[in-house]
Amino acid sequence: PVSTSQAVVGSIVGVGIMQKQVTLTGLDKIIICWIGTPIGGCILSIILYLVLARIINRFQPSWAGFDFIMRTGLIITGCYGAYALGANNVANVTGVFYGAGFLSIKTAALIGGVSIALGILTFSKGVMKTVGRGIVKLDAYSALIVVLSNAITVHIYAVIGVPVSTSQAVVGAVLGIGLLKRAEALRKRAIVGVFSGWIATPFIAGLVSISIYFVTHLTYVG
């Protein structure tokens, strides 16, 4: 799982370098939020895990009651997570078209939403496996906490107006659960791979955008 917001920002910076119009205004804020997203997701998941566990244990529901709570909670938090995803991540790709004057906000949002649904139906399987099992195995309660932490974290940044990564938030939340259970439960190789991807993504995206800009400029403009 890598960050679309990092890829988009890296691509924009790459094009800005080629056009000699790079502005660093606001970039420091975005980078700080990139760092804060997984940390925030991690801390929030730990807090929610402990607080909700205490509340559930206090009422001591039956197995049937606990199962109902988990199923209902996963549906509700899943819908909230999808809402937060749409509120923040759709703008990562479609925002540049709105800024260039090609699309209205509503049209860009609609196209982005449909494209996200298409991506889910095609190539999301591998990312799901990495997040759901690759870092640490999640039970129903842990999954509920991860989705809720991810949704709250991403929603906060959407309100602020900063593009952040849902993948960073959810991985941070999963790490929080892993730390709570025990450090040995974490699969370090998967974690290193994820963090390496986060570091490399903006640079690779920037290089790709520079290359594409150079080729198209040479072919159609030069």
Regions found by a protein language model. Give the residues of each.
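Alpha-helical transmembrane segments and immediately membrane-proximal extracytoplasmic
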Residues: 1-222
